[in-house]
From Swiss-Prot:
ATP 1 binds at G204, E205, P206, G207, V208, G209, K210, T211. The gene is clpB. Pfam families: AAA (PF00004), AAA_2 (PF07724), AAA_lid_9 (PF17871), Clp_N (PF02861), ClpB_D2-small (PF10431). One of its GO terms (cellular component) is cytoplasm. Residues 8-72 are annotated as: Repeat 1. Residues 558-769 are annotated as: NBD2. This is Chaperone protein ClpB. Residues 389-523 form a coiled coil. Keywords: ATP-binding, Chaperone, Coiled coil, Cytoplasm, Nucleotide-binding, Repeat, Stress response. Part of a stress-induced multi-chaperone system, it is involved in the recovery of the cell from heat-induced damage, in cooperation with DnaK, DnaJ and GrpE. Acts before DnaK, in the processing of protein aggregates. Protein binding stimulates the ATPase activity; ATP hydrolysis unfolds the denatured protein aggregates, which probably helps expose new hydrophobic binding sites on the surface of ClpB-bound aggregates, contributing to the solubilization and refolding of denatured protein aggregates by DnaK. ATP 2 binds at G608, P609, T610, G611, V612, G613, K614, T615. Residues 157-338 are annotated as: NBD1.
């Protein structure tokens, strides 16, 4: 007989190749029947199923075969070329005889198993010749079809290999409980019970719970909580990616799909398919003119021979399924909306026990409420309940990691002990009095530390054991509850009653006592090394990590920082007290959670002449509040003077160049939502750009070119403008009242900006012209920065009051603000110091002294 791929099915040829590898790894010269049987057991699902039905212990066979192969004679090296053993040839001849009798085209795995039953050694392990009639009868029953071509894989094997039995998972307690969603599950059951077109498709955003609804249906089928038309049905989830993967030859993928469909059809409605991401069936496997999966599904879907549940997102349904009306009409749409915050809290309460058992922690109710509410407010690019569940999962995982790791206090003592022991070894070599005295002190300190170390380690182990005991009890309770459900389903009521009213109650009492003892130890005021409960702060910490937004409760240092915020800003920004008060008040409202959650933290329009501190105040706010200079997004609005500049802000629309890049403003906020947005010189932007900002200022959101909703609800928006600066200058010179200045500037604003734009701003702040004494304070700030730069170069810096007055008088100009002062400091001081450094004038005396000499700045 020929041993070539064309004579075998794919799975049978894979078995032959694997048996060859087993023989090579065992340093054999021949491929024997034992190698074939071991390969079958390891790889073939149908063989495993047949052997299990024949009451054969597969693990024992595998162990016996391994020992038989180890006992065989071995070559010195692995053999590249192997011979077909006599026993193997007999096996394949018998397999071929069965193929002929079944009218199959190629040899498949079940034929090989039949051939092995005639082998002297293998027949003792699996099937002896007396059981061959039973085997043939079993094979006829299990085979739903004959092998029809060289790409045959039985439908049983295909379903087992590429499908997951959700009803079995529900029976085994693997699936999470499904809370709520009764209306959606009822609608799904209603469509499945139709005579034709009984195929629901669940459509919703990612993470709203489409797959969970199908899992809920599987649990209802197992519990018998469904109409008679769905009782005792199998719900099998098919993975389209796995079906396509590995289909090397043309037609192989279609064959796999056909095998699945024929198995479903032959089950006479007992099997319901679930295809997650059902949009993947459109075009799947369509290469070189072959049919795609959707065209293979359509006939059976229309006739009602196949009951299929699909799940996909709104966008994917629109892009793929709606393009094929023939496929779309065969499915009935069920819209799945994201649950409300209250519904999400109920879902989390239902899942709490599963996560507590998995992570060996306790999850408080306020943590569940925080996960739902904080995720809804701060995580805007994902959907409930998925994002809330992820928060709980990560917070519990983080706490579990802390529990299983060494506590920080013990770790610090361990490091200190190691450091002192090294110092001790070093000092033992010394003989002077100082070293001996130091050695004595170290030994005393080491003695105290080791006692403390031992006490803490004992306490840590004790607390850890208590937590582990509670965790083990929860696992036992979960396992007992599963056994009770299984006993009730199999009508073993005696066992169910014994478990429910005996074992379960006993375990619950033990858990209650242990939990109360642990809670009492926390309440007693004892200092505990470990914490077992996930609380609000844990959830807030995870949200902060994800979004960079501080949402945790304010600690004392942060409260002090916010209370002193106004003073801090006044130290860095001179002469603009009204602006500073307005900004600090807005930030205090936001950080204490009193601001409107549906608007930006604050939106300001800074007006005033050039050089009075509009942009500088924005930079100082970003540095002070967000603790980073990178938390400011600055857009120079003179770059947005054309009408088409709108696309630069929010991103180009589909079909235009740069669509994938996104907008300059929207992308910056999407990546860093907790930041300050500075739109400099807003009056220079095109009117259409201002119209785009209306929604941002009012609702705190904007839709970018790619259709994503970008949230500005955690941003401070600052717009600066020079409008009315000439009026402010003229009126300031005449010492006009501030209210008069404000009224005149407002008139100019209304001429330029639309009323709906001005009405959406929180505050319009007018920056006043700088007075001479204020400019002197600014000069001191600038010189302090210079001093800090010189200190890094080991140079001391001093300047006389006369020199400062000289700088201020020579740079004072109402029209230009503080910028001329910066220029004169650069020209008169920094340039001269730079020349002195280059001339090595500071090698001996590391001091820079600035004074006035002959009416000019003199750098000594």
């Amino acid at each position: 007989m020929k041993f070539v791929p064309s004579e075998f099915s794919n799975s049978a040829w894979d078995i032959f190749i694997l048996s060859k590898e087993i023989a090579q790894n065992n340093f054999q010269q021949n491929i024997d029947s034992e190698n074939i049987l071991l390969a079958l057991i390891k790889q073939d699902l149908l063989t495993s199923k047949i052997l299990k039905k024949n009451c054969v212990n597969i693990r024992k066979i595998e162990t016996k075969l391994t020992s038989l192969l180890d006992a065989k004679a071995k070559m010195k090296n692995k053999q590249k070329t192997l011979f077909i053993g006599e026993t193997t040839e007999k096996v394949f001849l018998k397999a071929n005889d069965l193929r002929v009798s079944f009218n199959d085209v190629v040899i498949s795995t079940e034929h090989i198993l039949y051939g092995l039953s005639y082998d002297e050694i293998c027949s003792e392990l699996v099937l002896n010749t007396k059981k061959i009639p039973e085997f043939l009868e079993l094979l006829n029953k299990m085979k739903s079809e004959s092998t029809i071509n060289d790409n045959f894989e039985s439908s049983n094997e295909t379903l087992d290999k590429f499908g997951i039995d959700l009803t079995k998972s529900a029976r085994d307690g693997i699936l999470d409980p499904v809370i709520g969603r009764d209306e959606e599950i009822r609608r799904t059951i209603q469509i499945l019970s139709r005579r034709t077109k009984n195929n629901p498709v669940l459509i919703g955003e990612p993470g709203v719970g489409k797959t969970a609804i199908v899992e809920g249906l599987a649990q209802r089928i197992v519990n018998g909580d469904v109409p008679s038309s769905l009782n005792n049905r199998q719900l099998i989830s098919i993975d389209m990616g796995s079906l396509i993967a590995g289909a090397k030859y043309r037609g192989e993928f279609e064959e796999r799909i056909k095998n699945v469909l024929k198995k479903v059809k032959s089950s006479e409605g007992k099997i319901i398919l679930f295809i997650d991401e059902i949009h993947t069936v459109v075009g799947a496997g369509a290469t070189g003119g072959s049919l795609d999966a959707s065209n293979l599904l359509k006939p059976m879907l229309a006739r009602g021979e196949l009951r299929c549940i699909g799940a996909t997102t709104i966008n994917e349904h629109k892009q793929n399924i709606e393009k094929d009306p023939a496929l779309e009409r065969r499915f009935q749409k069920i819209k799945i909306n994201a649950p409300s915050v209250d519904d999400t809290i109920s879902i989390l309460r239902g899942l709490r026990e599963k996560y507590e058992v998995h992570h060996s922690v306790r999850i408080s109710d306020n943590a569940l409420v925080a996960a739902a509410s904080l995720s809804e407010r701060y995580i805007n690019d994902r959907f409930l309940p998925d994002k809330a569940i992820d928060l709980i999962d990560e917070a519990a995982s983080r706490l579990n990691m802390i529990i299983t790791s060494k506590p920080e206090e013990i770790d610090e003592i361990d490091r200190k002990v190691l450091q002192l022991e090294m110092e001790n070894l070093s000092l033992q070599r010394e003989s002077d009095n100082f070293s001996l005295e130091r050695l004595k002190r170290i030994n005393n300190e080491l003695h105290d530390l080791k006692i403390r170390q031992s006490e803490l380690n004992h306490q840590w182990q004790k607390e850890k054991e208590e937590i582990d005991e509670i965790s083990n009890l929860k696992e036992e309770i979960e396992s007992t509850q599963l056994k009770i459900e299984q006993a009730k389903r199999s009508f073993d009521l005696n066992k169910a009653a014994e478990l429910e009213f005996g074992t379960l109650i006993s375990l619950q009492k033990k858990l209650k006592i242990k939990s109360e003892n642990l809670v009492d130890s926390f309440k007693s005021g004892e200092k505990n090394l470990l914490r077992q409960e996930v609380n609000f702060d844990d959830i807030a910490e995870v949200v902060s990590k994800w979004t960079s937004i501080p949402v945790n409760n304010l600690n004392q240092s942060e409260k002090e920082k916010l209370l002193k915020l106004e003073l801090t800003l006044k130290e860095k920004i001179i002469g603009q007290n009204n602006a500073i008060c307005a900004v600090s008040d807005s930030i205090k409202r936001s950080r204490t959670g009193l601001n409107d959650p549906n608007r930006p933290i604050a939106s300001f329009l800074f007006l005033g002449p050039t050089g009075v501190g509009k942009t500088e105040l924005s930079k100082v706010i970003a540095k002070t509040i967000f603790d980073s200079n990178s938390s400011i997004t600055r857009l120079d609005m003179s770059e947005y003077m054309e009408k088409h500049s709108v696309s630069k802000i929010i991103g180009a629309p589909p079909g235009y160049l740069g669509f994938e890049s996104g907008g300059q403003l929207t992308e910056a906020v999407r990546k860093n939502p907790y930041s300050l947005i500075l739109l400099d010189e807003i009056e220079k932007a095109h009117k259409d750009v201002l119209d785009v900002l209306l929604q941002v200022l009012d609702d705190g959101i904007i839709t970018d070119g790619q259709g994503r909703t970008i949230s500005f609800k955690n941003s401070i928006i600052v717009l600066t403008s020079n409008l009315g600066s000439q009026s402010i200058n003229d009126l300031s010179i005449r010492n006009e009242d501030k209210n008069e200045i404000k009224n005149i500037v407002n008139v100019e604003l209304k001429k330029f900006f639309k009323p709906e734009f001005l009405n959406r701003l929180d505050e319009i702040i007018i920056f006043q012209n700088l007075e001479l004494n204020e400019l002197k304070d600014i000069a001191k700030l600038q010189l302090k920065k210079l001093e800090n730069r010189l200190i890094k170069k080991d140079l001391n810096f001093q300047i006389t009051d006369e020199a400062i007055d000289h700088l201020v008088k020579n740079s004072f100009d109402n029209s230009y603000g503080a910028r001329p002062l910066k220029r004169i400091i650069q020209k008169e001081i920094e340039t001269k110091i730079a020349n002195n450094i280059l001339n090595n004038n500071y090698l001996n005396k590391k001091e820079v002294y600035i004074s006035i000499k002959d009416g000019c700045i003199f750098v000594n």
